[in-house]
């Protein structure tokens, strides 16, 4: 390439700036080669196809199961692998060629916020490095919008309210879930004039629900995470103004023409429509 790619220091070697550029482009090239091989093999009828899925937790438990069932019913010979990862990690896997489709989500930027700025907070060190990953250059297939709702213990004095503003919970102890969600909730709370006191954080949504039900605090969670909410433990209250995240299926543009990937995307969209209808059918007011 006409310029050194490695620099040596004693027994060690590291990439030069030119080497880092080449390595970054190489991962994209390898991913495109993998897609080309898959497409050629499918067209030639050498094998039925394989789809590697990565999804965030609440997507794995709601959208993914009916989509996989529909795919198996239509094309039982298609192989599918599934793993879980946060959106930043899932997108990195997609760019590195380690998966074919990544389910991800992101929240809209707040007015006055720097685009892409990481919302770290001293009470929440787990958010560091979890800023929303860049979707540039990826093919995004919209699936649904997922709003956040308030969770209160049954005996809470606001449990019977028809709606809540986050400021109504300013003096409460908060229990929040995944890093991306709690980072955005903290940003919204701070924009309304207070910082939530987070004594407990966990990426496990059933744990959040259990802690709220036990009276340990209040929470705000995505509706998708509440699809199997046990009855009689917590009270759901809509948050105003509405806070919602965009849920999408991401893939590389080169993968969209691979038959198995294209079919999986179709079934993900159908499953997402059903999930959205199920959310609209809850006891909460219409979305």
Describe the role of every protein-language-model region.
Residues 1, 22-44, 268:
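Alpha-helical linker/hinge and terminal dimerization helices associated
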Residues 1-15:
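A short LG(V/I)-centered, amphipathic sequence patch enriched
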Residues 48-131, 135, 202:
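Central regulatory/effector-binding core of bacterial HTH transcription factors
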Residues 60, 86-91, 95-99, 105, ...:
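Hydrophobic hinge/microswitch elements
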